[in-house]
């Protein structure tokens, strides 16, 4: 060994020590998770919920678009019809052990019934506990869109009311009268 190699080795050791000491006084990148909350991105896609209208009815009309859009097929539902003609899901089931939280179900939903929340703490010990039913998914509020009501916006007729008589609804147009 010559002097050049010894000086180079000592310099390498001193540089390593300086790097360790410089990192000792910096803020840590690691968070103690349960005590310190993890900062989430503004558009983080977490747990899926079903929302309600401003009137309190559930928004889902059981159109099955969310189940068709789901790439892993973790959503299943069965359509039923109320006395007034409005559709609703008789059962709505999401298997979160298969869900990849892609958000395609939220994009496909015409009524904004399905919404993804920033909640990510869904760990369970048994796989069966990750299958959520409609009662587990329904929340009491309207979610991200508080004033949206599908039946008011879409212009669907309500049984017992003539067309054009609802609030902010234009009178129906007779298309045969405007034909050439």
From Swiss-Prot:
[4Fe-4S] cluster 1 binds at residues 60, 63, 66, 109. Residues 48-80, 90-119 form the 4Fe-4S ferredoxin-type domain. It is an enzyme of class 7 (translocase). It is a peripheral membrane protein. Pfam families: Fer4_7 (PF12838). It comes from the Bacteria. The keyword Transmembrane helix does not apply. [4Fe-4S] cluster 2 binds at residues 70, 99, 102, 105. Belongs to the complex I 23 kDa subunit family. This is NADH-quinone oxidoreductase subunit I.
């Amino acid at each position: 060994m010559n002097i050049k190699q010894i000086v180079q080795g000592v310099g390498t050791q001193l540089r390593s020590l300086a790097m360790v000491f410089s990192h000792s006084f910096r803020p840590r990148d690691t968070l103690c998770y349960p005590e310190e909350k993890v900062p989430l991105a503004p558009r983080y896609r977490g747990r899926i919920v079903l929302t309600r209208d401003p009137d309190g009815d559930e928004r889902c009309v059981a159109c099955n678009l969310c189940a068709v859009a789901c790439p892993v097929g973790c959503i299943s539902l069965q359509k039923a019809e109320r006395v007034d003609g409005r559709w609703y899901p008789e059962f709505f089931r999401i298997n979160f052990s298969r869900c990849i939280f892609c958000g395609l179900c939220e994009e496909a939903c015409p009524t904004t019934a399905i919404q993804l929340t920033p909640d990510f703490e869904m760990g369970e010990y048994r796989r069966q506990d990750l299958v959520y039913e409609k009662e587990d998914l329904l929340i009491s509020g309207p979610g991200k869109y508080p004033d949206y009501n599908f039946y008011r916006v879409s212009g669907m007729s309500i049984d017992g009311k003539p067309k054009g008589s609802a609030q902010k609804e234009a009178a129906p147009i007779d298309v045969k009268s405007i034909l050439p």
